[in-house]
Structure formats: structure tokens, C-alpha cells
Amino acid sequence: MDFLEAEGGWNLSFSGSGYMGLYHVGVTQCLRQRAPRLIQGARRFYGSSSGALNAMAIVFGKSADFACSNLLDLVKLVERLSLGIFHPAYGPAEHIRKKLYENLPDNCHILASQRLGISMTRWPDGKNFIVTDFATRDEFIQALICTLYLPLYCGVIPPAFRGQRFIDGALSNNLPFSDCPTTITVSPFNGTVDICPQNISHSLFELTAFNASFQISTRNFFRGLKSVFPPKPEVVADHCRQGYLDALRFLERRGLTKEPVLWSLVSKEPPALVEGPRGTGHDQGQKTGPTVRWDIPNVLVKDVPNFELLSPELEAALRKACKRDFWTRVQCSVPGKVLAYLLLPCTLPFEYAYFRSRRLMEWLPEAPDDLDWMRSILKSTTLEVYSMAKSWLLRLGSPPGTRADSGLLRQQRGTAPSGNRPLNHRWFPGMD
């Protein structure tokens, strides 16, 4: 890998993946343990949505226990709720904001500036922004909330950042700088990414959307469902372990580790060295060296009888984060679930009123700005609809000859409709 020879000559980019974001934690732990130079010498860490949280954890030097416990706490919260993500108590943005204020240091904005790049989508034009400079701690936390804010899933009013409204960065740029030859990309979805799961059966079809490529397969489809509808904590933990194994495969195929760990899991001795130029299959588009060891096997979590031998720290963090207290075990048991559903007609109205009232009280300080924004959006939409209706009615009521003459006159004058004129976009300071 030529670009790894220069210190600070590469970046790491983590895709948005919702609850599948624990996959990034496994990848990060493998890089820290097997190839720490890739983490220590990286110039910048980019991320969108949940990938930005993992990039933040790397910049601040957070342990695997910190990342696993915070994400799996939210998964266990959804597991306890009788209606899952549809329960009125479910508020991912509020939960993450609270955790950020509790755990981030006072100088987090200074530590993150020029080291962390957060992808955000401006509402309503959908333009992508990558913010790398943060003025205050509150502004940094607000940027993280913006890149995590999936419309309707997290709420209906997009959060504000520097006077504008932003939503999930994965909707416009899911894998920042993935086309840069010095960027190592990571995604829990199979596609043209450096570190990602490898499907057993290869798909001939590929979907390119949101600046990322995904193979069209049933496995990717179910991974997408798990990213918004979290499964049991143990299943999410297995995706974290798979991230560790996929990162290890990436390192061994490119000769960045000396020990043939993956071959020791499936056989006693590795075969003869098989090197070849970059192929056109799963790893197409990866920015690495001239040769790749394609003989390195793809190992799944089920093939590893004792994951603790590979990474004791990660395994201990996952087991600790998956533990449930007594009351949670009662709620998640079959009798507890049956009782919760039987009492749902009685408890749901009170729970709905309580949680909605609490969110209303929390929203009141931001109500004036949000109402002004809603009024401006309604006004601009009304004027646009009125203008379109007016022009349509005028064209409908004018004779055909008049419409042709007006079009010819405009063509002779060399004017064009205003909709074809280029727009001037304003970028934030510190943008790449």
C-alpha cells in the first residue's frame, strides 16, 4: 500500500449504518490491535450517521467498552419497549444527545477540529456538507445530532446548525471521500468497500446511491432492516465480531500483519503464497497496493469457537454490554411480553401522554426558532405553488400562436428560464 508509507497520508471513512454501527467498533478494535499504525497515523476520520460516532470515539481515544455499552444500551431499551421503535418512549436523538453531554470532555470541539469530518445533508435542497471545524462544545454535539437525524424516524423538525437545518448525512454522502485513492472505507454492507462483509454468493447487480455502492442481495436487505429495526443485543454483538474478522481479512490480504490468523481458524497451515493484481470482484475500487493475497479465507463468526482468543478486550466489552438486569430479563421473557401486550390498552394512553408532554416541555426553548423556520418553509412553498399555478393557467388560457411567439421572442433575445440558471452555494468554513 503505497500511500501508507507517508505519515498522515491516508484517511478512514465510516459509512452510516444505524444499529449496525457496532460493526465499525469491531473493525476499529482489530486495527488498534493488529495494525495500530493505521489508526495513529491517519490524517482524518470521516463518518456519516452512526459512522460519525465511531470516528468520534477514535479521535477521543475511547475504548471498545465505551462504544459497545452506549450502543447496546439503546438496543436493550428498544428490546424492553412493548412496541419497539414505535413506542412513544423511543427517542434515539434525545438518548444520544444525553449520552454525549455526559461523556464528552469540555474541549471536545478542539480535539475534533481538523481531525474529524462529519457528513450532513442540508434540508430541504439535499446538498451535502462535511464539517471539520467546530467552534464550541455545543456546536460539535449539535453536528453529531444532525448527521444522525433520520426524518420521521427521529422526529419531524430537522435540527439547526449554524442557522440552517440539517438531517442524516447518509442521505447525501454515506461514505465521505470514498473515491479518494488514499481513503480506507468501512461499511457493514457488502459492496465496493475496503472493509465490509463478503457474501458467500456473489451478486451480479449493484446499486449505487448516496455516494456508496451496495450489492443487491438478500443479506444486504436484511442488514438494512437491522439498521433501523434493531434485533437482539446478541445478534448486534455478532455483527461487531464480524467487523473484527473482516478487518483482519483486509489486513492479511494486503500483508499488513505477519501472523496468518484466519488460516489458523480453518486449517493448520496456510497454502503457498498466491498474489495477484487487483481484481474486479468484491474488492474492486479499493485503494491499496499493487498485489493482494486472494487466498486469505473469509471467516464468519460461527467459524470461530472462542472469539476471546482473538480479542479478549472486545469479547469482554460485548459480554458486559449484553448483560441484562433482573427487571429487564423479566420484561423480555415470554410471560413478561404477554403481560405487557395484555395491559397495552390500559398503559399506552398514559405512556403516550407522559412522554409527549415531556418532549413538549423539552421543545419549548427551541419553539420560537422552529416555528419561524416552519413559517418560512410554508411561505416559500405557498409562493412556489402559486407561481407554478399562475404560469400554468396563463399558458392554458393563451392562444397557441401567442405561446409560440413568446417562445420565439425569448429565444431571439438569448434568455433562458430562471430555473436553468446556476445556483451559488455557500460553504461553511473548514469544509474540504
From Swiss-Prot:
Residues 12-181 form the PNPLA domain. A motif (GXGXXG) lies at residues 16-21. Keywords: Hydrolase, Lipid degradation, Lipid metabolism. Its EC number is 3.1.1.3. It catalyses: a triacylglycerol + H2O = a diacylglycerol + a fatty acid + H(+). The keyword Hydrolase applies. It comes from the Eukaryota. One of its GO terms (biological process) is lipid catabolic process. InterPro entries: Acyl_Trfase/lysoPLipase, PLPL, PNPLA_dom. GO terms for molecular function: triacylglycerol lipase activity. The active site is at 49 (nucleophile), 168 (proton acceptor). Residues 404-423 are annotated as: Disordered. A motif (DGA/G) lies at residues 168-170. A motif (GXSXG) lies at residues 47-51. Pfam families: Patatin (PF01734). Has abundant triacylglycerol lipase activity. This is Patatin-like phospholipase domain-containing protein 5. It comes from Mus musculus (Mouse).
